[in-house]
Amino acid sequence: MAWRVDSEIDGRSTRAEFEVMLWSDLVRTSMRSGILATYGQMLRTAYIYIASGTLWRLMQLRKGPVIAALYPVVMLVAQAAVALALAYAAGAVLRLWHPGLFWLGMAVIPWVLMGFRRYDNRLFAHYLMHDYAYSAAARGAHPRDLEARLDEFAMRVLAALRSDVDEVLLVGHSSGAHLAISLLADIVRSGAVQSGGLTLSFLSLGHVVLTVSFLPNAHSLRRDLKHMSAQRQMT
C-alpha cells in the first residue's frame, strides 16, 4: 500500500512518498478469528509467556511493557466477567418465575461477547491478542511467510535509499516495531547506509519490542537489537 503527498510550505515545495508493509493478512490466515478461538489463543499465549519466564522478566521492567503485554488479556477476561455477571443477573430474574429457568440466563453470554467483539475497533482486545498470539506461536521466531514479507519490503527501502530523495524514514508502530528493527538491521548489514550518505532515520512507537524480545526463540531479534544499539550513523 502506497501513496504520495505534495505540499508547498512557505514557498517551498515538498513531496513525501509513503509505503506500508502490510502483514495483517498473515495474522488472519494463521489465526482463527472467532470469539472462542481468541480465548483459546489467549490461554495458549499466556502459557507460553508464563512457562518460558518471559512474563516474569517483563514484570522487572517499567510499567509500559507490562501494560502492553497484559492489556488484551485483562480486557478479554473483563469482557468474560461482564458476560457472566449479566448471565447470572438474567438467570436470577428468570428464577423468579421458575427455579429451573435460571440456566437459561447463560444464553446472554454469547450475545454480550459478540457485542464487545463488534466494538473491537475501539477496544483492540481481539486485534492485539491475535498479534501477540502470532508472535508467540513460534516463541519469538519469525514465521517463514513473515520473513519473506520483510525481505520484500527491505528491497523497497533499499530502492528508496538509492533514489534522489533527501531522507528515508522507517517507522515501526505497535506490533510492527520489532519487525522494523529486524528490517533496519538487515539494511544496515547490507552496507546500504554509509556515513555522509543519504539519511536513514528510524522511529518506533510502542512497547511491543520488549514483549517479543524476551521470548525464548527470539534469537534473531535480540541479535538485531544488539547490532543496532552499536550503530552511530542512525537518527
Tell what function each PLM region has.
Residues 39-42, 87, 91, 223-230:
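Short, surface-exposed, charged/polar-biased interaction segments
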Residues 14-72, 94-165, 212:
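Active-site catalytic motif of lipid deacylating hydrolases and related acyltransferases
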Residues 78-101:
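Juxtamembrane "helix exit" motif at the C-terminal ends of alpha-helical transmembrane segments
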Residues 139, 144-235:
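Serine-dependent carboxylesterase/thioesterase catalytic core
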Residues 69-81:
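Transmembrane alpha-helical segments and their cytosolic interface motifs
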Residues 8, 24-26, 207:
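Generic structural motif
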Residues 1, 22, 172-174:
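The conserved beta1-alpha1 loop
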